[in-house]
Curated annotation (Swiss-Prot):
Primary gene name: NKIRAS1
Protein name in the entry: NF-kappa-B inhibitor-interacting Ras-like protein 1
Region of interest (Disordered), ranges: 168-192
Residues annotated to bind GTP: 11-18, 61-65, 120-123
The keyword Cytoplasm belongs to this UniProt entry's keyword annotation: yes
GO cellular component terms given for this protein: cytoplasm
SUPFAM superfamilies: P-loop containing nucleoside triphosphate hydrolases (SSF52540)
Protein family per UniProt: Belongs to the small GTPase superfamily. Ras family. KappaB-Ras subfamily.
Native source organism of the sequence: Macaca fascicularis (Crab-eating macaque)
KW Nucleotide-binding (keyword) present: yes
One Pfam family per UniProt: Ras
PROSITE patterns: RAB
C-alpha cells in the first residue's frame, strides 16, 4: 500500500460532492440531504486499483463553490489528484468544472496530476441542461475521463474512483536520478 494520495473533490454548491463520497464509502444516501452545506471534510478510503493493489486515498470534500468564490489556492499545491463534479441538470456547474480544469492546468503546470470528472444526477435526466455528448467531447479535448453517475446507484461511482486510484499508484515514469550502470548523456567524463 502506498503513502496515501491527496485527492480534492470540488465543484459548485449542491452538485452532490458529499453525497458521492458518502454513498461510495459508506453506502449512505439520504434523499433531501442535498441542501446541507459542507465546510470541509476529509475522508479516508482504501481503494483497490486495476492491478489489485490497495491505494490509500485522502479525499478532501471541499466547500461548494458559489458565484465569485474560487477554490482556495492551497488545494492546488498539495493535491495529487482531483475529482471535478458537476450536475447534469445545472449548466453553470459544468462551466465551473471547465474553469477548474484550466486552473489546475495553470497551477500544476500539467505535471503528474490525475483528474476525473463526474457528471452527477443522471437520475434527473428530464431536467438535463448539460448534453452528454458535449461533455464527453470536452473531456476528450482536455484528456480527462468523464463519467455520468448518480448517487442513487452506487455501482456508477466505483469505476471512476478505481481508475483514479490506479492512475495515482502508477510508478513515476521518469526518474531524475541516473540508474546505476547507465551513462548519462549530460555527464562530462574525465576518461579521455
Amino acid at each position: 500500500m502506498g503513502k496515501g494520495c491527496k485527492v480534492v473533490v470540488c465543484g459548485l454548491l449542491s452538485v452532490g460532492k458529499t453525497a458521492i463520497l458518502e454513498q461510495l464509502l459508506y453506502g449512505n444516501h439520504t434523499i433531501g440531504m442535498e441542501d446541507c452545506e459542507t465546510m470541509e471534510d476529509v475522508y479516508m478510503a482504501s481503494v483497490e486499483t486495476d492491478r489489485g493493489v490497495k491505494e490509500q486515498l485522502h479525499l478532501y470534500d471541499t466547500r461548494g463553490l458559489q458565484e465569485g468564490v474560487e477554490l482556495p489556492k492551497h488545494y492546488f499545491s498539495f493535491a495529487d489528484g482531483f475529482v471535478l463534479v458537476y450536475s447534469v441538470n445545472n449548466l453553470e456547474s459544468f462551466q465551473r468544472v471547465e474553469l477548474l480544469k484550466k486552473e489546475i492546468d495553470k497551477f500544476k503546470d500539467k505535471k503528474e496530476v490525475a483528474i476525473v470528472v463526474l457528471g452527477n444526477k443522471i437520475d434527473l435526466s428530464e431536467q438535463r441542461q448539460v448534453d452528454a455528448e458535449v461533455a464527453q467531447q470536452w473531456a476528450k479535448s482536455e484528456k480527462v475521463r468523464l463519467w455520468e453517475v448518480t448517487v442513487t446507484d452506487r455501482k456508477t461511482l466505483i469505476e471512476p474512483f478505481t481508475l483514479l486510484a490506479s492512475k495515482l499508484s502508477q510508478p513515476q515514469s521518469k526518474s531524475s536520478f541516473p540508474l546505476p550502470g547507465r551513462k548519462n548523456k549530460g555527464n562530462s567524463s574525465s576518461e579521455n
